[in-house]
């Protein structure tokens, strides 16, 4: 069995006549945090969305938890032991924190989610409750389950969004700008949270805050113009003359 949770091999993505990603290869191994950085338009979000099955792949392969696919579908991520957060929070404001977290256990498309948020099998309800409780504990929000999501401060909502992604017990967690919109103190708190999460769950993150990337990542891939132009540890990347951090 492979030691890689994620392997992106020679991936190319095209939109019309534009090549958004060109022959990109990255890996994520158990027990590590891997960062994707680069300027706006470098291809970070496109790569992230390709892994999540949100954009079609022109060529190359993705191996997710030992399953090789040409183009994963978003609803298949749970079966592949992968989960993700969205930019911002994406919580349902009229639902409680606990209800929002439970939604993360659903295997859904956008339409099916809106039609039936809580179409859970009754026999699984106890297990779901336990997993949602554990997910909230992992983000230090176990006392907030009954509160309305939109009543919480934005930094706390970010934690709830991560808990929702954790409820399916993923081996690999994809974090889309976890520090986005946070102040300095909350960014430090997020750094600590990510380090604690990687004990049980490997992480691939896209992030513009370099203090987060340098603090929490074991390895970093630098993208520009749709290509990986550098790869290494935080110290190795920091010392590259082409990277101004």
Task: Give short role names for the model-derived ranges.
Residues 112-150, 192:
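Conserved ABC ATPase "signature" region
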Residues 244-245:
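Conserved small/polar residues in nucleotide/adenosyl-binding loops
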């Amino acid at each position: 069995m492979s030691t890689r949770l994620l392997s992106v091999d020679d991936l190319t993505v095209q939109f019309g006549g534009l090549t958004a990603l060109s022959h990109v290869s990255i890996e994520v191994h158990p027990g590590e945090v891997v960062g994707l950085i680069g300027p706006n338009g470098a291809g970070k979000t496109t790569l992230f969305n390709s892994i999540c099955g949100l954009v079609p792949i022109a060529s190359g392969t993705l191996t997710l938890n030992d399953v090789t696919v040409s183009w994963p579908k978003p609803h298949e991520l749970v079966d592949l032991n992968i989960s993700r957060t969205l930019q911002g929070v994406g919580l349902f404001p009229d639902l409680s924190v606990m209800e929002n977290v439970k939604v993360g256990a659903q295997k859904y498309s956008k339409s099916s989610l809106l039609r039936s948020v809580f179409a859970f099998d009754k026999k699984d309800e106890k297990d779901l409750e336990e997993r949602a409780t554990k997910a909230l504990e992992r983000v230090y929000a176990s006392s907030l389950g009954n509160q309305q999501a939109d009543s919480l401060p934005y930094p706390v909502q970010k934690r709830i969004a991560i808990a929702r992604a954790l409820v399916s017990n993923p081996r690999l967690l994809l974090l889309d700008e976890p520090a986005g919109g946070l102040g300095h103190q909350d960014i430090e708190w997020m750094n600590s949270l990510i380090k604690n999460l990687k004990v049980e769950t490997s992480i691939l993150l896209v992030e513009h805050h370099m203090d987060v990337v340098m603090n929490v990542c074991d390895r970093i891939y630098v993208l520009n113009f749709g290509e990986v132009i550098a790869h290494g540890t935080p110290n190795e990347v920091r010392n590259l003359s082409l990277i101004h951090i």
